[in-house]
Amino acid sequence: GPVRGLARLLRRNPTEAERVLWQALVNDRRFAGRGFKRQVPIGPHITDFVSFPLKCVIDLVPVKETADAARTRAERRVYLTQRGYNVCEVKASEVEKDAGKVLDQLHDLVGP
């Protein structure tokens, strides 16, 4: 469907923060094997990163976000939370500044 096609397009064209965070998630032993995937549709929404085994979604918040985008992100958070997902919002600017620090914070949320 259209959501799946959009997810594929987004996977092919990651933002700088997505690229940096994905590399960090793949290379950091604390997250390896935890089942994280990139740009995955869940219902009508596309998640930036999700781990189905952990029921954890990482949502990147862009530096400049329109009111519409913020509203959509809030709706996505409600939708996912209602379905038992833990949604971690991460500022893209923080990923670009210090991905290691962001991973430490995520690890605290995700657990061992």
Regions found by a protein language model. Name each.
Residues 38, 42-110:
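Basic, amphipathic alpha-helical patches used to engage nucleic acids or provide basic targeting signals
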Residues 1-34, 111-112:
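Solvent-exposed, charged helical/coil patches
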